[in-house]
Amino acid sequence: MLFHTIPEILSYANEAYGADDAIRWKKSKNEIESRTYSELKNDTDSFANAIEKLGKKGQHIAVIGPSSYEWIVSYLAITESGSVAVPIDASLPAADICELLDRADVRMLIFDEARSDVAEAAAKSCHDINVYVSMNSTEHCPQVLSFNGLIDDNRGSYEPAVAEDALCTIMFTSGTTGKSKGVMLTQNNLAENATCLDMKIGPHTVILSVLPIHHAYCLSMDILKGISLGSVICINDSIMRMAKNIQLFTPDMILMVPLMIETFARKLEEVRAAGLPAEPVRKKIFGERLHTICSGGAYLNPDYVDLFAEFGITILQGYGMTECSPVISTNLSWDIRKNSVGKLMPNCEAKTVDGELLVRGTSVMQGYYKMPKETEETLSDGWLHTGDLGYVDEDGYIYLTGRRKNLIITKNGENVSPEELENALSVNHLIKEIIVRESEGVIEAEIFPDSEYAQNAGIADIRSALQALIDEYNVNAPVYKRIYSLKVRESEFEKTASRKIKRS
């Protein structure tokens, strides 16, 4: 069912699935707490009442903290009240967060006590913020209000009156290069992106939400789409406990980024090499019910699609960007093309100009908040310049070849996509992470090796082994695509919140 505002999604879910579980989370080691769709709607309405009573309706309100029921209610209430939500990356330093709060003109801050340092820093430097709400405190304090206290003090229904084209979220990009930008998304941008595609997912599907909740992919697909379908959204409390939480919550589906999938792939490859039976191994690693993993955010080795299929798990590779709310395309369970990032969403069209993919549709952002120059560079006559190189086939499936801004132009004028070379080499298990770039006139590969794999494989001289892999690649590569310099790292590359490697 197609929706055009976020309050419409929640109201529908309340009517259709009121008594069913909406959100589950771990209360203690093996104890699960839950809230129904009716409870979610009632708490959202009550907190929206509180926002209006505090005089913050229509203003910009930031939310910061790990994934939690309180975070979800806060976001839904902000958007229901006609205010503008500003989700913040909880892993950033307090000083960086305060800069984002100022840039986004935030007037109210809702925070998890795990980041109480942000509230303290903001109180000193963000003078426009005059309301602070703690998600965890049980009582109101002079300087900080209690989330639960506000809900209890403002119980009652709320009648949202929000326009489809109203700004409802400013979401800062976690770009791999340059200054983060505040992407302006409307009610219709987010609601339609989450609900325009029927992926044949039935109600009561159990989803384990493992990605950072401030990230567009998680917010759209786990939370908004999940609510619209009457799913049971289970909150993963830590990436370190993800394997245990899979066993605890027994999900049907999980959204992951490729780095997570690669970790599981290594386990499956070990199992396959040992000749162990697939079904008991699948249950041990993925629980009794997991059947689908949705992947997005970066390149995924297409061979993993076949590997996971051997264990009864479907991988659906997708593609998107925050500026498109975020999903642009996805593979479908009944029509998987493993070398493609999927079929265009039904509310989206695409074309290529000079090799760059441009998209247009109802999911495309309004622009970057208070950054007109960058907006003009990215949006042209409604077309969003993705910065990605690729093409669309006759069936509407997208194939990506690299990033325009990363393109290497050789001395003889040849264009080389570093991603193409990275993908070709990263299939080798010795290479854990890789960046290809131009350095002093030649193509260089900087590699973080998998030392555990090297030890298990009896590789003593890692550098020589890596050089041998590059030499093997160079034999079949055109001269202008050959790698002539190798740099070996001793630590992982720095990454964004969505687990993309920062290229500079």
Language model features with spans:
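Conserved pre-ATP/AMP-binding loop-to-beta segment of ANL
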Residues: 18-21, 134, 154-172, 179, ...
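Conserved AMP-binding/adenylate-forming core of the ANL superfamily
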Residues: 23-55, 59-68, 72-76, 93-98, ...
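Conserved AMP-binding A3 loop
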Residues: 34-38, 168-194
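AMP-binding/adenylate-forming catalytic core of the ANL superfamily
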Residues: 92, 109, 361, 367, ...
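Conserved AMP-binding/adenylation subdomain of ANL enzymes
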Residues: 191-206, 213-280
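Gly/Ser/Thr-rich phosphate-binding loop
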Residues: 252-256, 264-336, 432
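Conserved ANL (AMP-binding/adenylate-forming) active-site segment centered on the GW(Y/F)…HTG consensus within
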Residues: 336-338, 364-387, 418-423
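Conserved C-terminal "lid"/linker of ANL adenylate-forming enzymes
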Residues: 433-436, 440-441, 471-504
